[in-house]
Amino acid sequence: MGNYPVVHVAYEDAESYANWAGKHLPTEAQWEYAARGGGFNTIFTWGNQYSPQQANTWQGKFPFFNQQQDGFGGISPVGSFPPNGFGLFDMTGNVWEWTADWFRIDRRGMEYSFNPLGTSRVESYDPKKPWEEAMHVIKGGSYLCAKNYCSRYRPGAREFQASDTGTSHIGFRLVSEPKPALGDDLIHVLNRGIGGSDD
């Protein structure tokens, strides 16, 4: 059995696991930065031309026929495709991934900060279904995304999903904050404490 992504996980489940692990779900901005892998002028994580050998997506006319040029008709094991420039696997295709951000179609308030937190839950809505509950942003596309249906296997693409929904094509990944570097003053004190000089 391969190392498959965890699926059938609602947002609340993913968030609970992240808290337990001492990590968190990425913001939409963090996710997109990681997905681009240092390449900010390309359409896909791997370049500007679509290639079925780069991500687990639907090849053919959805939902009638999948040519499976990538070798998979459903979820693939993690690492079945080449990593991006940061060494991250499956940032597009395979399964959608939850982000910490609430969905708002116009991304209001996100354009002026480096790591925007997105909109508030109160402002989150789907203009086509304003009566529905607030939605979270999902990123990356999945093995069900096809050119004729859902070509969202691009870092900049986004979709919304009800927070209480877990499906066979939505998973998550976690982010951990870098540990603070020891400052020179602290290193000097530590050296003194273990027999270092006081120079």
Task: For each feature predicted by the language model, list its residue ranges.
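Short coil/turn motifs at beta-sheet boundaries
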Residues: W131, T165-T167
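Short, structured beta-strand segments at or near domain termini in extracellular proteins/domains
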Residues: T167-L182
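Pro/Ala/Gly-rich low-complexity, hydrophilic intrinsically disordered segments
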Residues: S176-P178, H188-S197
